[in-house]
Amino acid sequence: MLSAQDISGLMAMMPAFATDNAGDYRARSTVDVGRLHAGVDRMIGDGANVISTTGSFGECHTLLMDEFRTLAHETAAVNKQRVPLFVGVTSTHTREVFEKCKLLEGAKVDGILVGVP
């Protein structure tokens, strides 16, 4: 469990690293895992003390559920608990918030962020 002392320094608000075709409404699996891994490594290497994802760039309404799961689990996998990781589960309704929380089971995340869209 994290304490207040574990959260200090720079919190990197990470975007969803998207595939080149992510803007196409027919696109699926639009999380670019290679870019995501490189981005997380760079953020940590550049001094980020905490990482937060799916919470500040509109992912709550732009990612499909399988894309959300991929982004969260891949971020946790590359992070390897080097820094605290928070994942946003914001949605337009409560049921989806709980579904997103269930999708995080098994991922090494330190906390969730819930906002009102």
Which stretches of residues belong to each language-model region?
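Active-site beta->alpha loop and helix N-cap motifs at the rims of alpha/beta catalytic domains
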Residues: 2-117
